[in-house]
Amino acid sequence: MNECVLCEGLKNNREIFNRPLYETDNFVIFPDRLPMADFHILIVSKKHYINIWDILNVGLELELEKIIQHVNNRLISHGYKNIVLFEHGKAHKSETNGGKSVEHFHVHIVAEVPLLMQTLKKSHSEIIVYNSFDEMKKAQGVLIDYLYVRDLSSSVMSVFTMENGIASQYIRLLLYSQMSKTLAEKLQITGEYGFDWKTHDKVITPNIVDFYKKIII
């Protein structure tokens, strides 16, 4: 059985994994390999978990929330707005992958994405709303694949469920479709599949790492 690409990367310290931006006992932050926003990072669990409910069930939600708020506060202090967190969630009993490219718990934080929440709410009527991680934990997960999305200016957590499954990198595609030409040129991403990190060989340079570290640390 092949090892999870994130577990392998964390263990062997390869590629972007030798350039963490910030870490705690159980989580580590990396820059996204192909950013879809002016600021785009991943929070990844060091151990192999599948989804947010795994994190809640092992009691790591307070540590995760502390990291989320740290990043959010740092972004606000640097003048960023419209900060959103999202996860492509795979239900354990699902035969599909929930739109995840890698089946290892990770959430994205993106900034300056004013249309994302609005677009999701217009496009998807199946929305479950939680006001805290405690509420989510009591719900004990969902049986189908989902999108977990939070506007970090609020405590509200939205879970969008999709009976027909979720396309791979679905939110990345939404962000790419909403991206201005100026930002696309700045991020150097073009083409019909410009959102697909698997088709790009973009290298995370030390300059990029330094840019993110100055914001986060």
Please provide the spans of the model-predicted regions.
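HIT superfamily nucleotide-processing domains
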Residues: M1-I217
